[in-house]
């Protein structure tokens, strides 16, 4: 075969589903002209487990352990959205102490998720050292989770009307110590990474998304805020107790992979600010709204009867969903995590539609990698931050 015959031949390369840079079981069919990417087709579904259909055959309390398997690196957010939806359907009030505890857990989970994005992202583009550093801090967060919930991952901690258990003795002091320590670690990350010339060469100007383009594609989270759009659901939807704390929306206007890195690094610092304020101002009172027992079939319980005092201290699995529909969302580490819930006067949801941020954000990947080099696929995909358990559901 002559050289002229092969010069214009395109090559098709399969990346994944086992390749470590695919962050799970994502498969990309990439068409190359030399080193230049001509086309990229993501193949999904390798981790599909029918999560939406399972929800239609479980009560909310029975379904809670399943939801932590969507985004298994930020499980507090999947739990939060699962209990927020029936709380809004039933107009259930969450005690102030429980709301503060939720905020603390959510922000710790956000930091843990961003840390486990940072390490593999840098490993993908050739920097191995931070990959080991981030696990050092992440272990401290998991120790806090274990002390409060009994589980390092898959916590099963949130409940309709509050949380499963109060914070143990000494936990608040340990968490404050972690916050002070972690701020010094973030400074270390920035010294090590942010101005590293090799890192900047790999990420600056790579995978640029404009603000209007990000909105048109339905992007959310750091992907959207790195394109100059100051949109954060914690500010927009005023859920939990976020309005009571002093913090700012972190954003950049460049829209490239470096901007997405800077947004996430800044978000970790802001999360620490929120956690510190919540720990210092956490009120007393109950950690769970026991009044939600009235949503059971017995409308007027005897407050001193045997069932209430010794059995029904926790939300009943027979919590009924009224005949309504609503969309509930939270600001997860990867973007807008939403649930479209339809109740049908039964204990099971009639429809439970999940809006995963990773799945929506992944849509733009084929457009971003076109006319880029093959090595830039790892940079761009890493900067999107996906978890396949959430993408495939």
Curated annotation (Swiss-Prot):
GO molecular function: NAD binding; oxidoreductase activity, acting on NAD(P)H, quinone or similar compound as acceptor; quinone binding
Pfam families attached to this UniProt entry: Complex1_49kDa
Enzyme Commission designation: 7.1.1.-
Any one Gene Ontology BP term: photosynthesis, light reaction
Membrane topology (UniProt): Peripheral membrane protein
Localization (cell): Plastid, Chloroplast thylakoid membrane
The family this protein is said to belong to: Belongs to the complex I 49 kDa subunit family.
General function of this protein: NDH shuttles electrons from NAD(P)H:plastoquinone, via FMN and iron-sulfur (Fe-S) centers, to quinones in the photosynthetic chain and possibly in a chloroplast respiratory chain. The immediate electron acceptor for the enzyme in this species is believed to be plastoquinone. Couples the redox reaction to proton translocation, and thus conserves the redox energy in a proton gradient.
Assembly and binders: NDH is composed of at least 16 different subunits, 5 of which are encoded in the nucleus.
Name listed for the protein in its UniProt record: NAD(P)H-quinone oxidoreductase subunit H, chloroplastic
Organism: Panax ginseng (Korean ginseng)
């Amino acid at each position: 075969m002559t050289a002229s015959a092969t010069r214009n031949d395109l090559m098709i390369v399969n990346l994944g589903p086992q390749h470590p840079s695919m962050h799970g079981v994502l498969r990309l069919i990439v068409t190359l002209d030399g080193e230049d990417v001509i086309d990229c087709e993501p193949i999904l579904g390798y981790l599909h487990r029918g999560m939406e259909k399972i929800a239609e055959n479980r009560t909310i309390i029975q379904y809670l352990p399943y939801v932590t398997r969507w985004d298994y690196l930020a499980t507090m957010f999947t739990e939060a959205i699962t209990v927020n939806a029936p709380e809004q359907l039933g107009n259930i009030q969450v005690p102030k102490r429980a709301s503060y505890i939720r905020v603390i857990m959510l922000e710790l989970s956000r930091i843990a998720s961003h840390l486990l994005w940072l390490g593999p992202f840098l490993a993908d583009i050739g920097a191995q050292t931070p990959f080991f550093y981030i696990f050092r801090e992440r272990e401290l967060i998991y120790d806090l989770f274990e002390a409060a919930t009994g589980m390092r991952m898959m916590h099963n901690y949130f409940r309709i009307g509050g949380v499963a258990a109060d914070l143990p003795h000494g936990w608040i002091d340990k968490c404050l110590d972690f916050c002070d320590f972690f701020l010094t670690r973030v400074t270390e990350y920035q010294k090590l990474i942010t101005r590293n010339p090799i890192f900047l060469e790999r990420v600056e100007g790579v995978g640029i998304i404009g603000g209007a383009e990000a909105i048109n594609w339905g992007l959310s989270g750091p992907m959207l805020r790195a394109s100059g759009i100051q949109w954060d659901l914690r500010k927009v939807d005023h859920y939990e107790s976020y309005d009571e704390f002093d913090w700012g929306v972190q954003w950049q206007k460049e829209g490239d992979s470096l901007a997405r890195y800077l947004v996430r690094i800044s978000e970790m610092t802001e999360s620490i600010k929120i956690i510190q304020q919540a720990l210092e101002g956490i009120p007393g009172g109950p950690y769970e709204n026991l009044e939600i027992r009235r949503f059971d079939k017995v409308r007027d319980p005897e407050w001193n009867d045997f069932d209430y005092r010794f059995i029904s201290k926790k939300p009943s699995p027979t919590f009924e969903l009224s005949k309504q529909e609503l969309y509930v969302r939270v600001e997860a580490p990867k973007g807008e995590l939403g649930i479209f819930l339809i109740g049908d006067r039964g204990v099971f949801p009639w429809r439970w539609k999940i809006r995963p941020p990773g799945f929506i954000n992944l849509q733009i990947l084929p457009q971003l990698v076109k006319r880029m080099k093959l090595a830039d696929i790892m940079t761009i995909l890493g900067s999107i931050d996906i978890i396949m358990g959430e993408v495939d559901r």
